[in-house]
């Protein structure tokens, strides 16, 4: 069986449809050209590569806290999509419940966009997310997680770490941010998305300098707490990226087919509630 025939769930991707859902006027970055990817276009990509489901992540670029494009994709996706919403730290519980009823399974924390200080007062939100059985999808880079890890260690919420925690490969595995990430494995509530290599690798495709970090994460978290993701449609990518080569890459990074099935399918089914 090839990687294209194995059951798969893509756990980090975005949809952009500015013709139907215009970007905010004050958006810092407005995806354009090949960065635009509608739900219909993404569905064709998933069909072509045998991907059963996908977790859509609300982007700060273009839409920020406007989740309508993603919610429309979920509503019309016939059960194929779930979502991670972008919200204010002071969102009320009724609004969170409404998002959950619409197919949202968690909330995005993007310290690479907002900075660490933006989330220093988010402990109350974490508690409320845990009470509603919603998760956090956390994007950090470099040493940011070292500052935020204590808050997540105390909270009872499930956390999905985006893009391997975006370490700096040349800094080595003992860098504070990556060391903090490995330490979070002990909580049993933290999961890692093996994705977004182009966002942190210093080498070009096939990102050989990312592989030691992927292997360290698989060792610390095990395949039962790791997931795969494409990061389609590849915003701000410094080079052309295609879906197929990324699937080939995870086959190379996780060569054991039993472990790979857990990463590609069984773990996201269990954690995100997709049907298996």
Locate each region found by the language model.
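Mid-to-C-terminal alpha-helical segments outside catalytic/metal-binding sites
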Residues: 2-9, 32-53, 216, 221-227, ...
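Active-site neighborhood of phospho(di)ester-bond hydrolases with catalytic His/Asp-centered motifs
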Residues: 8-11, 56-57, 85, 108, ...
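Conserved, mostly hydrophobic/aromatic
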Residues: 12, 46, 70, 99, ...
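Glycine-rich phosphate-binding "P-loop"
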Residues: 26-35, 54-57, 104-117, 236
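Alpha-helical scaffold segments that flank or form the walls of functional sites
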Residues: 26-77
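Active-site gating/metal-coordination segments in enzymes
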Residues: 61-144, 150-153, 193, 197
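Catalytic pocket-lining loop regions of alpha/beta-barrel enzymes
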Residues: 105, 119-227
